[in-house]
Amino acid sequence: MDLKLDDFLYDLPEDRIAKHPPKNREDSKLLLYNKGNISHQSFKDIVTAIPVDSLLVFNNTKVIPARIILHKDSGARIEIFLLEPVQPSKVHEEVMNSKGSCQWECMIGNAKKWKIGSSLTLDSISLQAIRISTNIVEFQWKDDLTFSDLLTEIGKIPLPPYINREVEKEDQDRYQTVYSKEKGAVAAPTAGLHFTDEIIGKIKAKGTSVDYLTLHVSAGTFQPIKAEKISDHPMHNEQIWIDRTTIENLLKREKTIAVGTTAMRTLESLYWYGAKLVGGNNEFFITKEDPYQLELVTLEESLKAILEFMDQSGKNRIGGQTEIFIYPGYDFKICDGLITNYHLPGSTLILLVAAFVGEDWKKIYEEALSNNYRFLSYGDSSLLMK
């Protein structure tokens, strides 16, 4: 399929980009799309809108204060944006609990003012940041603090670039989901920002199953597509974790609804991991080409292969990496529904939505624009059912 980026663009006026969250999490509009039909409700109505026989899957990653501002003796301001952990481990949980030192791959603002091999210090907490190479920074500090504690002291929440304002007090709470747990994301899984504990409780009370997995959202989620051929776009690599119970529940499911594009990408990656296992490959790394090249197996074969592998290796939780790229032509293996906000024109997330609902994505976005929906991370919501 020859896809052109121009086919996934739309006009997004600046004043439609939500710069702040609504007063209450659930005070959002909800567009319902079901097999071509569109209706408009309030997000509070999500409880009745979700089919009872569904499994609702959330991404429980927690946004870390990934922006660190330091100054040289000359006064030059250097901003360090944490991307991925490097040492002592590439596993977020282990690095966040490390004491004394760690290394991260970073984006560095005003990098020309900070020479490789030199260090910056923050005396108030005895922090030293050493630029090891172009984009690797080593942090050293007193080992009575974990790196997580350190970030709480000095880091700032990394709001998306299109919000285009300084972090405010409300963002500490509102740019996290109420169920966030596993520290490691540098962007929020924003479809979940609308949910409250009360709404999740009501969903469970009506008999709908709820489950969690983890994808640590990377800064690559904001990377614009520049490649002439869409499939040539270099997809970002993200760390994912799934519990045995979640896989077992997927086997029992009637319908699976992903809360957000990150949950959807994790679920679909899980299927392809099972397909790899059936084919004799146990490396949990899903490349962007895998879904378009691997031999197909049934969903049951895939999930059972994963459970069997977990039995053999004595694991109740599996982790891997995914750079899955979902665009029109992709055949969904696990997801029957998607709860999601409204995304940037020409982004990989628009392509994912277009893959899920087809050409109707344009109708959905036109409806949202003409009904004064708020767009992007702090914007309104939609429930899309196939």
Set out the residue ranges of the language-model regions.
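Surface-exposed, charge/polar-rich loops and edge strands
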Residues: 1-386
